[in-house]
Amino acid sequence: MSHAINYTQHKELSVEMNDFILSLPCSSPLCRRLDSPGCSRKSSNCQYQVSYGDGSFTFGDFSLETLTFRRAQVPRVALGCGHDNEGLFVGAAGLLGLGRGGLSFPTQAGTRFDNKFSYCLTDRTASTKPSSIVFGDSAVSRTARFTPIIINPKLDTFYYLELLGISVGGAPVRGISASLFRLDSTGNGGVIIDSGTSVTRLTRPAYVALRDAFRVGASHLKRAPEFSLFDTCYDLSGLPEVKVPTVVLHFRGADVSLPAANYLIPVDNSGRFCFAFAGTMSGLSIIGNIQQQGFRVVFDLAGSRVGFAPRGCA
């Protein structure tokens, strides 16, 4: 099986904030829920600091605010008012935490939105349409296929899913089994879905098996030099259409068939495309946002499940 693809973002979230922000005192119970709470000597206000894997960080006052999404207001949301934001934020006005942590937006405001939300990420390189996020019952797509959320008591901020296997070209990849993605009793291993990670990372044995299967299916394509973390690249310059093997992620209860643009991506202007997966020496695998593009990804926290609806950005 193969995809025929023609190679012929902006991501925004409109949130209004009140002019009045209530800074939290250092003695606030909310302040003590921060991983690394700080306290201003001048004002005795609670301060936060968060660092990210790419080296970016934000520092400022921990405050209460009313957020407005179009006509819906959500009062008394605890958030950080950043005074020092550095790194790869690329002009973003802020970050909305959507994880399972105690201070994430879904946790704080979940009951108002029936503990349901979904997003659809558009292709940054090919679409002028903005990405979207929906809260409430309307977030649940009728065409979504669902897989259960697995709880990791040792690390409860992430959404863990059960990945059973991967198919390439219509055949299960030999060497990939559910055991490579299993969450063990110590909280290690497993698979999470994360909108903040670009490229899907698989445990090294799973990645090597997937990569090798794809290389066999794409052996008719001209290879190109490696690029950054991508070790499987092709020279597609001058080709208006290319056939590549299909890639399907098999979650428990949900098979997710990826569009070709979600795993063979352009990395320069000379026609070089790379297989957009990578390996990791860690036991934790991550489903990144490139592989999520174009799907409406539904988080039904009330039902403890995550769903995938193809062509969900319409």
Residue ranges and their predicted role:
Residues G53, L79-N85, F135, P153-G165, ...:
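Aspartic protease catalytic domain
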Residues M1-V77, H83:
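Signature of the N-terminal lobe/flap region of pepsin-like aspartyl proteases
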Residues M1-L30, L67, L95-G99, F181-L221, ...:
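Aspartyl protease active-site motif detector
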Residues N45, S51-L161, S270-C313:
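Aspartic protease core domain of the pepsin/retropepsin superfamily
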Residues D19-F20, L24-P25, R32-S40, D61, ...:
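Processing junctions and N-termini across compartments
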